UniProtKB/Swiss-Prot annotation:
Catalyzes the transfer of a phosphate group to glutamate to form L-glutamate 5-phosphate. Residues 277-351 form the PUA domain. Its EC number is 2.7.2.11. Keywords: Amino-acid biosynthesis, ATP-binding, Cytoplasm, Kinase, Nucleotide-binding, Proline biosynthesis, Transferase. It comes from Corynebacterium efficiens (strain DSM 44549 / YS-314 / AJ 12310 / JCM 11189 / NBRC 100395). It holds the Pfam family PUA. It comes from the Bacteria. Belongs to the glutamate 5-kinase family. It catalyses: L-glutamate + ATP = L-glutamyl 5-phosphate + ADP. This is Glutamate 5-kinase. Pathway: Amino-acid biosynthesis; L-proline biosynthesis; L-glutamate 5-semialdehyde from L-glutamate: step 1/2. PANTHER family: GLUTAMATE 5-KINASE, ISOPENTENYL PHOSPHATE KINASE. SUPFAM superfamilies: Carbamate kinase-like, PUA domain-like. Substrate binds at residues 56, 143, 155.
Amino acid sequence: MRERIATAKRVVVKIGSSSLTSDEGGHTVDPNRINTIVNALQARMEAGSDVIVVSSGSVAAGMAPLGLTTRPTDLSMKQAAAAVGQVHLMHQWGRSFARYGRPVGQVLLTAGDAGQRDRARNAQRTIDRLRMLGVIPIVNENDTVATTGVNFGDNDRLAAIVSHLVSADALVLLSDVDGLFDKNPADPTARFISEVRDGNDLKGVLAGDGGKVGTGGMASKVSAARLASRSGVPVLLTSAANIGPALEHAQVGTVFHPKENRLSAWKFWALYAADTAGKIRLDQGATEAVTSGGKSLLAVGITEVIGDFRAGEIVEILGPNGEIIGRGEVNYDSETLMPMLGMKTQELPDDMQRPVVHADYLSNYASRA
């Protein structure tokens, strides 16, 4: 798997805030650190790979110009810092890549962009066109307009979504840790985990929260790595200090193996990125049919419709006790669906005998482990 990452044609590389900012408080973008990273990225591109960068650091980069000594927690102040810092951040990326004659392009995304299929496709096309033009895409979350509860939460998840959007062959997550440990690596008894093949390899792992500068702790990186693996993308998690060997031969850090039964592009998007418009609750029989996979959802197994939605929108699918078991694209609006609940297909009018959610447009969480 490490060889597969080392030779991947299209690579998404995510760099955390702490890997881009100075040691003195982490409040300014460090040109030397960015140059070191770009040197390694250039070497990988010279070896024949396409590289897409997911860069954190806009809020951290805006702290010093605004006279802030601690990362803002107030939403409006965070957005102001991001607005100021993104300019500084892109300036440094541009200067560093210019040493090799490579232009950069800024791509700012929100969770709403990924949540709407047409907007996600537009983002994909933009990134693809930048690559065709020889431009290095620098992707970041648009913190200036993102709102609490409607955002990616951290750029680790954003990197996983971008990996899916661009059909990446590998994702490299860079931070300030050498890889995954079963507890705080400062603990001398901490055990390094070299390979993660499934959820069993993560049993007993304690992942902490984010640090002073960034928002993505180890828990978010593990979550993002597993998210990417569900779309068939192998992931390497390591320190930015190891970026050279990470991109050259991948013999460092922790590797997350991709799932063999990778989700289709639509099902991955529906489960992990799409906006949802409402909910439908199922009885036990329908729940078992959905979670076993391959079955369409029929009206007879639905017990409740929650919220207002239109035909063609994505809804959350709940089990009998309200647990979320999947998502799907509904063929009927909520008003039409209500009187259909519990009815067998043959009891419905001819124009209402389609499945409520066809199996091709139904994705469940049962196989995420």
